[in-house]
């Protein structure tokens, strides 16, 4: 069974834990030493000071979480170990690699407490094999990747140009802006693709 390290309290990230458990993997929080992959999950905004900016649109900041996740992300990067970032996790990973963020964008945050759904496009073989060149995903964020971190390349975009997924050119690092764990199993939706296919493919590839 593959073990996935999460820096935090597993009870706060039940959707992730349940989705990976359904795929035969375990999310653990005690030690990253023997884990097969690091998971950087969704959550509040990364403090702009970590990418050299003042606060202009960031909110809900938790600097202690930022520091802990940046430290473990940079450790896994230095050791060339697999990382999966989801939503905030994609943004934090970009910052860990020296990139910056758009502190506020319109049209991607929830409406009446529910995730938006929008189309995304790709020419990347990983995604086209799973879902085709255009498909629908959920959306629940108000920040996004701006200047790319070192070694990252975009592989999926929303129609407005927002970067929806990145992959590292040489390291086993992959991240998405949407929430696949909220598009599968008990949270499967008829208006998006099945997020389980993506999570299973990441477990296999990374």
Model-derived features with residue positions:
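Active-site-proximal beta-strand elements of phosphoester/diester hydrolases
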Residues: 174-178
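N-terminal beta1-alpha1 cap of cysteine-dependent amidohydrolase-like domains
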Residues: 1-88, 95-96, 102, 106-126, ...
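Short, basic/aromatic recognition patches
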Residues: 139
């Amino acid at each position: 069974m593959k073990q996935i390290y999460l820096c935090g309290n597993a009870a706060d990230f039940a959707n992730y834990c349940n989705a990976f458990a359904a795929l035969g993997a375990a999310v653990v929080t005690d030690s990253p030493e023997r884990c097969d992959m690091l998971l950087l999950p969704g959550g509040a905004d990364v403090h702009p000071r970590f990418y050299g900016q003042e606060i202009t649109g960031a909110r809900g900041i938790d600097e202690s979480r930022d520091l802990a996740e940046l430290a473990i992300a940079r450790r896994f990067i230095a050791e060339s170990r697999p990382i999966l970032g989801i939503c905030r996790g994609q943004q934090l990973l970009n910052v860990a690699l020296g990139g910056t963020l758009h502190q506020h964008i319109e049209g991607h945050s929830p409406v009446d407490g529910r995730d938006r759904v929008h189309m995304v496009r790709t020419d990347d073989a990983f995604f086209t094999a799973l879902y085709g060149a255009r498909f629908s995903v959920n959306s629940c964020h108000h920040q996004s990747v701006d200047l790319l971190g070192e070694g990252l390349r975009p592989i999926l975009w929303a129609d407005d140009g927002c970067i929806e997924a990145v992959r590292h050119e040489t390291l086993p690092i992959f991240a998405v802006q949407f929430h696949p764990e909220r598009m599968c199993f008990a949270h499967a939706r008829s208006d998006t693709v099945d997020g389980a296919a993506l999570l299973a493919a990441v477990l296999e590839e990374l």
